[in-house]
Amino acid sequence: MYFPGEGLVLAAGKVLTGHPWYGILSVSALMCAAICWMLQAWLPPSWALLGGFLAVLRIGLFSCWVNSYHTAGSIAALGGALVLGAVPRLRKHPQLRYAMLLALGAGLLAISRPYEGLLLCLPVAAALGHWLWARKNRPPAGALLRLSAAPVALIFTLGAWMGYYDYRAFGSPFTPPYVVDRETYATAPYFVWQSPRPEPAYRHVVMRRFYEENELAAWKRIQTGFLPQTLMKAAAGILFFSGIALLPPLLMLHRVLRDRRVRFLIVCLAVLSAGMAVQIFIVAHYLSPFTAAFYALGLQAMRHLRLMRFDGRPVGLGWVRLTVTICLVLGGVRLFASPLHLQIPQWPASEWNSQWYGPIEFGKERARVAATLERLPGKQLVIVRYSADHNPLDEWVYNAPDIDRSKVIWAREMDAADNLELILYYRERNVWLIEPDTRPVEVVPYPDSRALKCAGQKSPSTPALNYHANRAALAPTSAAVAPLAQAP
């Protein structure tokens, strides 16, 4: 359902290093470097370096942006940093390299978070337009043409590629994957002025629960309490980027709002606030194009805090040093949490905070089971049976890009006919049943899988058979079944 930026990063990691996570790690490193580069255009170099360091501590080491396969946050933050870092440089020194970096950043936003990227590009376009048409120091027409030709060509090339991508995937160059997903599954609208759609026919209960109980519930909360929900969204976003440790500089917010140095960044965040207020949902990566702007304003607040004096004493300097020290201590605590046997708060007690110190517990048990299955001889098919109250956010069913050639394939359990079709399609595989909500999680042979294959081969057009009568006669499908069934 997501735009192709994430897939490109994962594919690059897989092709170049053999593991997709290294693509995520590389983009996260580039993101932190780009944030530092952007800050150098707005703040003194020493403060820009501090900002890059804080970005590494807060979101570059432990957050869900680097410790998950959902990479849109890092990609869009990288793109936003390139855009906001190129704008002041381009105005001071109209050079092709800055124009290309701006176009590259806008392209990264388009393939990762296009809506929020548009919110960022609107004030950027307005500022550049004002510079080109209303300022006396604008470049000559010929120089402007040479300056803009290559960036415009880059943007048009990227747009054409995205149109081709959508056409090959969905039959229309103007139908992005996100639209297809929302029209197929979602009932809750995306913006506050829209109405819910009729409930579609879901093949799996867990899908219905996600779109009905999670998304539709969020829409209802917005309708009955717009202001408190908007304030909660704002607080959640601030806490993700700053945490408690970086909140003291916000005491200087009244001075930052009057600061000419960062006035344009304030306008950018005001546009973001308006765009997020009318949007139903918010997750940390929705704000990612504005990551560098967040840190720029936070650092400018720290600069004002540093100058604060009380009774002639520089108390602000102590506050700034204490803030940075707390960030360092928290980073060290998170790094050595396991050897120190520290209990880290987990979902759902700390949903938003866990996004910076993650990973959350989701996925750990699946990774253990997947590693066990990968060691078995032959190919495996895993059928996952969820309980009625399974958390829809704890998903076990996802696969590698080339599903049919994968060592292990994961699928949700369906009705008898669909299960038979699945098992017959992968008849050469060992078939297992996993119930993620049982403790301990066990991997056992799928009931009657061998009888299902035999019955399907004899009568493929009659799937509704009483397969469970032969369950007692089934033998393990491999010698590894017994120890798997006893796995803790």
Model feature map: region roles:
Residues 104, 121-125, 148-156, 265-266, ...:
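Signature aromatic-anchored transmembrane alpha helix within multi-pass, membrane-resident enzymes
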Residues 9, 75, 82-101, 109, ...:
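Membrane-interface transmembrane helices that cradle and orient dolichyl/undecaprenyl
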Residues 11-12, 38, 51-56, 81, ...:
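Membrane-interface alpha helices of multi-pass inner-membrane proteins
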Residues 35-59, 77-78, 91-101, 260-267:
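Transmembrane-helix signature of polytopic, membrane-embedded enzymes
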Residues 72-75, 109-112, 118-119, 171, ...:
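Hydrophobic/aromatic-rich transmembrane helices and adjacent perimembrane loops
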Residues 87, 313-389:
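Membrane-embedded, lumen/periplasm-facing catalytic core of multi-pass transferases
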Residues 19-43, 81-85:
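Transmembrane-helix motifs of polytopic, lipid-linked glycan transferases
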Residues 30-35, 125-129, 134-135, 224-263:
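Hydrophobic, aromatic-rich transmembrane alpha-helices
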